[in-house]
Amino acid sequence: MKFLSEDFLLNNESAKLLFHEHAEKMPIIDYHCHLEPAEIYENKKYENLTQIWLGGDHYKWRLLRANGIPEKLITGDGDDYEKFLAFAKTLEKSLGNPIYEWTHLELKRFFHIDKLISSETEKEIWDEANQMLATDDFRPRALIKNSNVKVVCTTDDPVSKLSYHKSLAKEEKDFKVLPALRPDHLISITDGHFAEYLMELSAVSGIKIKDFKTMIKALEQRFEFFTSLGGRLSDHSLSTYTFAETKNVDLDSILQKAKENQTLTDLEYNQYITALILEIMKLNKKFDWTMQLHVNVNRSINGPALRKIGENTGFDSMGTQANISEELTKLFSKAAELEIIPKTILYSLNQNDWLELATLIGCFQGEGVQQLQLGAGWWFNDTAKGMEKQLEIFASQSLLPNFVGMLTDSRSFLSYPRHEYFRRVLCNFVGQLIESGRIPDDEALVGKMIEDISYNNVHDYFGFFKNEDSKQ
């Protein structure tokens, strides 16, 4: 089969039919990403391919380092064209890596350039792409609109004033840019900046934080504020997690120790985190939000690189907490007793957790359709094989037609072809089930499932259009 042909990843006739007749046409809701709302509002113009392709993309940075490229041409102050040449040189060696497919798919879909990036074509591609980047069609809003994206959910700190979201809500009519609340600084209470952060949270919420209860009250105010601007999700990263009973625990004392940068015992930290997550579950439930939990990830594990370059620069790895499902089971059992389990999507960076998490989810489903879900293959699992494995586990342990599907988790405005990539994998997976006689060869039945997973489910699950739908 030709590279990136119309039928790439579609290995049977059923898959081809499902993709071209059902998946391909569906709009996109990107419910988890790391795009900057300021860049969307200001409609930033990118000067060249390096700025839009390599800026902030730690997936690509890892490959560049593996190819011996100096940091000056990765995150440093090197010339943009030299950075692009280094990437082109590296990409030639990335055969079999999804970045090779993604990059060429982006080149083909956005720039309509159907050439392989290589030392022979790099200058031609650079010039041709940069000429197009100078046009308004390659500003962020046009890229979003022309990708048929209806909703973008950014990732935002609770103290954010969401000024760009406010402005976009007034001015942008073709798509929604909605905030998703991610309180990392309430989880990372041992980083030495906790007291300073609580002062920020207090100021923006208008609530004096003097203890754990008032901290949660301030957080609730931020949930209300985010909700007023269309917020429907919270997101939480737990590198590791150990459940701890919180009954009769002096949480105020733990909070005070953290504010004073005193060393917390492991038990104290686990008690605080458990209490915090339970309160966050309660708030998600109250506001009819969805809680996302990202677990089993080791972040910024290269100390010198962290100090020199900073976080989110490509020095993270898969976590190996073997009992994470056991600890989460205790958390959800406690939440069930308190009747505070919200809609939840669980992601683990370690594939070994997926089957355990899928069976855990089945024990705590509440009222409503698929309230708890196993999230899409995340980060290092955002590959054809990773996507297929997640689909297989979801289908075998729950109801695949209820799955809310793909998200980019990206910092790039050119990442939307990843939805196409996922839909191709989905159609091929389902097509194989048809071809092997495991599900009916019924286009109406199966085609609807493909359309639902691609768009309809996420539209209904999160309620982004609840007000508009109620008026119809």
Swiss-Prot record:
Pfam family, one: UxaC
Keywords, comma-separated and alphabetical: Isomerase
EC number(s) reported in the record: 5.3.1.12
Class of the enzyme per the UniProt entry, highest EC level: isomerase
Entry annotated with the keyword Isomerase: yes
Pathway per the UniProt entry: Carbohydrate metabolism; pentose and glucuronate interconversion
Disulfide bridge map: none
Catalyzed reactions per annotation: D-glucuronate = D-fructuronate; aldehydo-D-galacturonate = keto-D-tagaturonate
Family: Belongs to the metallo-dependent hydrolases superfamily. Uronate isomerase family.
Protein name per its UniProtKB record: Uronate isomerase
Originating organism: Lactococcus lactis subsp. cremoris (strain MG1363)
